[in-house]
């Protein structure tokens, strides 16, 4: 088993020999939670072995080295595992719905934060599902890769991965030249082109419908925050978004007047309201930030980092968002400025008017756990080591990686509890997030 070292978290615990010896029994008990969701005995067995393989200390965690480590030189076992992952008809979504209940039991909090982000996976060739030469975040440049969209969870008690979607570039869905590849990869016929923000929405909506995980916030970067339709859908669920937005995002300082223009008596009557003639133009969020007085900015600690507190300057004010050129909802504009470089980050949030700045500062530091999940998954759990090419195989692999990651979160939770002197109550897990102010 690996010695799991989370990034930018509270100090981790070394696994003692007794702990290591007990992990296989603990893993078996953990897998038993999900076993009833696999209809066939072979699926139950191979799913347990796959999760076990992801936890092994191996240089690469694709199917063959994992099976050889667990089963020895058994080529039939390798083929059986490949079939289980690439073609097996088992329900990822049912497994993840059960997983959300487990996350709530261990980490759930009324102030929980859902986090949306993408993670890319460099790949060779053109046959893997959804692969395309596109911007690859892992490499920081355009490259041949697959793009995933992920939903995570963070609370004062820890963090976890929740769900995953594979992004299919539009040509993969609509271009006849890709028809053979779609069939070879097993892409379902009813899959339509979906943007990354709407893939994120599909995961949020599914989680909300399940009603199994306590949460209040949704945090995302500007790749998602620029999509006002996504933000309005989140608002419609009664959740509070905290979304980074591009610097050219526009807003009004005060709600401008609108009216239906008078009808001239000829042609069609004006169908909708418009800004009145003397209405001010909306400003960019950068223009709004530059006009703030110096005393509008306060220095705040975002979170405790591995090298000490992370500090930035913050300002906020109410603004009116733009929707199709007209005034939309009144929201918070939150501005975060790097103390050393002056780099500006801009956010919009539909949190209530009464929300204190300290809570918005807290949420601004809650996106990092999902990035940490990606680092941990790729470094320790083979998140990017898969060699399957199919639609089903990609989602199966990611689902089992999500389970493997949360198993380690649970182990650290138990070890942290047992390390407290005299059984004293303490933080519930070694992979902690800061506590929100006022809670």
Protein language model features and the residues they cover:
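Buried hydrophobic packing segments
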Residues: 151, 203-204, 377, 403-407
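Conserved, well-structured functional cores that handle cations and Mg-NTP chemistry
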Residues: 2-219, 223-250, 257, 264-281, ...
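Intrinsically disordered or highly flexible coil/loop and linker segments, enriched in small
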Residues: 36, 40-43, 60, 213, ...
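Basic, amphipathic alpha-helical segments enriched in Lys/Arg and hydrophobic/aromatic residues
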Residues: 381-439
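Short amphipathic alpha-helical "interface-anchor" segments enriched in bulky aromatics
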Residues: 118-120, 224, 272-278, 355-388
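Catalytic-loop motifs flanking and including active-site residues across diverse enzymes
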Residues: 147, 369, 373, 396-402
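An anionic, glycine-rich sequence signature occurring as long contiguous blocks
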Residues: 156-185, 189-193, 246, 251-369
């Amino acid at each position: 088993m690996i010695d799991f070292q989370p990034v930018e978290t509270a100090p981790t615990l070394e696994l003692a020999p007794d702990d290591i010896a007990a992990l296989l029994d603990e893993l078996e008990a953990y897998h038993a939670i999900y076993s009833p969701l696999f209809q066939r005995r072979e699926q139950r067995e191979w799913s347990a072995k796959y999760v076990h393989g992801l936890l092994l200390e191996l240089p690469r965690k694709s199917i063959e080295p994992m099976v050889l480590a667990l089963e020895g030189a058994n080529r039939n076992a390798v083929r059986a595992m490949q079939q289980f992952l690439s073609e097996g008809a088992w329900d990822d979504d049912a497994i993840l719905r059960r997983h959300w209940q487990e996350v709530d039991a261990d980490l759930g909090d009324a102030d929980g934060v859902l986090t949306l982000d993408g993670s890319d996976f460099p790949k060779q060739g053109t046959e893997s599902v959804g692969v395309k030469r596109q911007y690859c975040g892992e490499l920081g440049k355009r490259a041949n890769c697959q793009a995933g969209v992920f939903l995570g969870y963070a609370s004062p008690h820890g963090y976890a991965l929740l769900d995953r979607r594979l992004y299919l570039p539009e040509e993969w869905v609509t271009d006849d030249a890709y028809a053979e590849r779609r069939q070879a990869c097993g892409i379902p016929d009813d899959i339509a082109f979906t943007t990354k923000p709407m893939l994120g929405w599909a995961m949020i909506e599914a989680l909300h419908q399940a009603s199994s995980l306590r949460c209040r916030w949704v945090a995302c970067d500007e790749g998602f925050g620029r999509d006002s339709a996504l933000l309005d859908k989140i608002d419609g669920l009664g959740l509070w978004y905290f979304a980074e937005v591009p610097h050219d995002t526009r807003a009004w300082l005060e709600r401008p007047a609108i009216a239906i223009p008078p009808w001239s008596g000829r042609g069609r009557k004006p169908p909708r309201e418009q800004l009145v003639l003397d209405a001010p133009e909306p400003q960019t969020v950068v223009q709004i930030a530059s006009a703030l007085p110096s005393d509008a900015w306060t220095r705040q600690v975002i979170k405790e980092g591995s090298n000490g507190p992370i500090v930035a300057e913050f300002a906020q004010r109410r603004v009116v968002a733009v929707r199709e050129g007209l005034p939309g909802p009144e929201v918070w504009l939150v501005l975060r400025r790097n103390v050393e470089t002056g780099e500006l980050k801009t956010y919009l949030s539909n949190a209530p008017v009464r929300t204190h700045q300290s809570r918005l500062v807290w949420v601004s530091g809650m996106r990092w756990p999902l990035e940490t999940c990606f680092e941990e998954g790729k470094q320790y759990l083979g998140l990017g080591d898969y060699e399957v090419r199919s639609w089903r195989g990609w989602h199966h692999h990611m689902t089992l990686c999500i389970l493997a990651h949360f198993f380690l979160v649970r182990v650290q939770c138990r070890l942290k509890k047992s390390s407290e002197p005299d059984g004293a109550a303490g933080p519930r897990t070694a992979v902690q997030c800061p506590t929100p102010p006022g809670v």
